[in-house]
Amino acid sequence: MEAKSTAVKSSVAGTWNVRSMNQGKLEAVKQEMARVNIDILGISELKWTGMGEFNSDDQYIYYCGQESLRRNGVAIMVNKRGRNAVLGCNLKNDRMISVRFQGKPFNITVIQVYAPTSNAEEAEVEQFYEDLQHLLELTPKKDVLFIIRDWNAKVGSQETPEVTGKFSLGIRNEGGQRLIEFCQENALVITNTLFQQHKRRLYTWTSPDGQNRNQIDCVLCSQR
């Protein structure tokens, strides 16, 4: 998809695991997006079928799901200001989607992902990273790249030079190590490990019953 665009100098981005999104929840997400002034919102576990894009009031939604099953699913929702800066999109599959924005001094590509869980078969994990690598290779080298949301990985508090800082939680697991290696191979830094925050702000996942919390989400950015 190609579109006329107007560059933006700054924008606010966010990400949300909606655990499925019907029409009622879509309206709630739109209202929350407007309330906190988010220009670009990545969404995971959308659980819609098919792929496409459409306008909904002041927001524009790009989405990817499976052809017939309501599982996984990702989307990127942009407000009017963000929509005016869109250069194109890549509706890859039910686990990843990208939208490219005109920016100053560099254009920006945002990729929303929903990685396989720790219980997934190794073949599924490898396919995910192969697909993501292909998506990165389609991204112009000069773009500032952001990859956001559900990695289902724990990178832990151990620092890795040029990839992570020291502000993270827990112990690195196998999924976290795989993510670290992917970042090293592609010159990416995990930005949310670089800044000190209160511990309650580090948790990115809460179980449906509210009993368990974890930090499994990461925001990756190209090293500059």
Q: Predicted segment positions?
A:
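A shared catalytic/ligand-binding motif for oxyanion handling
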Residues: M1-R224
